[in-house]
């Protein structure tokens, strides 16, 4: 005889849905900022993938788009200068890397200010508040704050993940400092990596691939 179905007890003090979204958004911002700490000018800027992904560029990109989605979409205004978005002939990917004339401090301050401005705009809105994303297709432009917070959280987590990998490629630093990685010595990590590599080679061999 199967046990009767039970309903889990309700959380005595559930978090407001908007507060939950904002808390996770703040956590991803902090994770992204943390990946740029303690690096040289070269390391914080240099591209580590074929498509040029770099840490300072990720911060510049997120700073640029979050103020668009979380401020401008809902009628907010700001005085942030983002010349890489100006004009019809703007350079592709200009928001994804920092020029030699753009200081690290300028990009970090842009990130902090865009976060503050975005949060100030969102603070006065309900999740069902409506806005318009002018750069989206006409049939999708009208949105709610709920939609955009989820979209921006997805965007932020996506790029925080990029930053995690790029930082590990730069100097081996990994994780978020909140116990998300097991405590292992360099030798243990080397042995673990070799096990993964050996398994990949064996799987390829069984599939008839040459490695």
What is each residue range found by the language model?
Residues 1-19, 65-117, 128-132, 169-211:
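Short, helix-capping/interhelical loops that line the mouth of catalytic, cofactor-
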Residues 9-27, 42-65, 93-110, 133-158:
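Alpha-helical scaffold segments that form or flank carboxylate-/histidine-based iron centers
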Residues 35, 69, 121, 166:
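Short alpha-helical functional segments enriched in proximate histidine and acidic residues
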Residues 40-49, 116-150, 170-183:
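Acidic interhelical loop/turn segments
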Residues 158, 163-166:
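C-terminal or internal capping secondary-structure element at the end of a domain, subdomain, or sheet
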